[in-house]
Swiss-Prot record:
One of its GO terms (cellular component) is cytosol. One of its GO terms (molecular function) is chorismate mutase activity. This is Chorismate mutase 2. Gene3D superfamilies: Chorismate mutase, AroQ class superfamily, eukaryotic.
């Protein structure tokens, strides 16, 4: 969101529009990634290319990418959360003058470690073929773009939670004060009708964005580069549940007066 979209203009409609646009980004990046097989050598630790580095080639490329992006201010945005936050270089770009819209505890909520684990161990085997054909740098670039898009979508739960809290603070406050009532918070946050609409929409987008275009009018069936049902499953089993997890974590800390500033 642009600076002018924050604070008094923040609304569920504005956030919903952003989440819908983010669906496009995730699907297009997913289509790019599945052009390649898993290429498992990329993720093996330690990498044989860097004797003094204990991580994988993928981790090395990802950390270097985040370090460069940090220098130019990517992680000054409340919408962005690094996968490797330790020892990131300071930004040479001055921070935005936008007023803060989230509670300061938002900075402490980062589930990218969980997202990365799910991506490597569940999503890649689900979407990509089991082979190793090289092209490691290009494959990693696709991984990084897709992971950052998924992370942004999931951590947008902080904004969703903030707006819901502002709109219905009388409902959320007792549950937050109870602290342990995570199930009640999750129930209050869940709208099954909306989730079904999201699953259907992303499946339709995957079918449209990923269809193989042909000049033959009598083609018997449309071939898709990515299975629409798998994209729907991606949202159903991972993206939406993890987004709600972020919302719950944010709300449980929303009343922390010790860290509360003008919002």
């Amino acid at each position: 969101m642009a600076c002018g979209d924050y604070d008094d203009k923040l609304s569920l409609d504005l956030i919903r529009d952003s989440l819908i646009r983010q669906e496009d980004t995730i699907i297009f990046n997913l289509i790019e990634r599945i052009k390649f097989p898993i290429n498992s050598t990329l993720y093996k630790k330690p990498s044989s290319w860097f004797p003094d580095f204990t991580g994988s080639l993928f981790q090395y490329l990802f950390q270097e990418t985040e370090a460069l992006q940090s220098k130019v201010g990517r992680y000054l945005s409340p919408e962005e959360n690094p996968f490797f936050p330790d020892n990131l270089p300071a930004s040479i770009v001055p921070p935005s003058k936008c007023p803060p819209v989230l509670h300061p505890v938002a900075e402490s909520i980062n589930i990218n470690e969980k997202i990365l684990d799910v991506y490597l161990n569940q999503l890649l085997p689900l979407f990509c073929t089991e082979a190793d054909e090289g092209n490691y740098a290009t494959t990693a670039a696709c991984d990084i773009q897709l992971l950052q898009a998924i992370s942004r979508r999931i951590h947008y739960g902080k904004f969703v939670a903030e707006v819901k809290f502002r709109d219905c603070s009388d409902e959320y406050t007792p549950l937050i004060l109870a602290q342990q009532d995570r199930d009640a918070l999750m129930k209050l946050l869940t709208f099954e009708v909306v989730e079904e609409m999201v699953k259907k929409r992303v499946a339709k987008k995957a079918m449209i964005f990923g269809q193989e275009v042909t000049l033959v009018d009598n083609a018997k069936e449309v071939k898709c580069k990515v299975d629409p049902l798998l994209v729907s499953r991606l949202y159903d089993e991972w993206i939406m549940p993890l987004t709600k997890h972020v919302q719950v974590e944010y709300l449980l800390r929303r009343l922390d007066q010790n860290k509360l500033t003008s919002i």
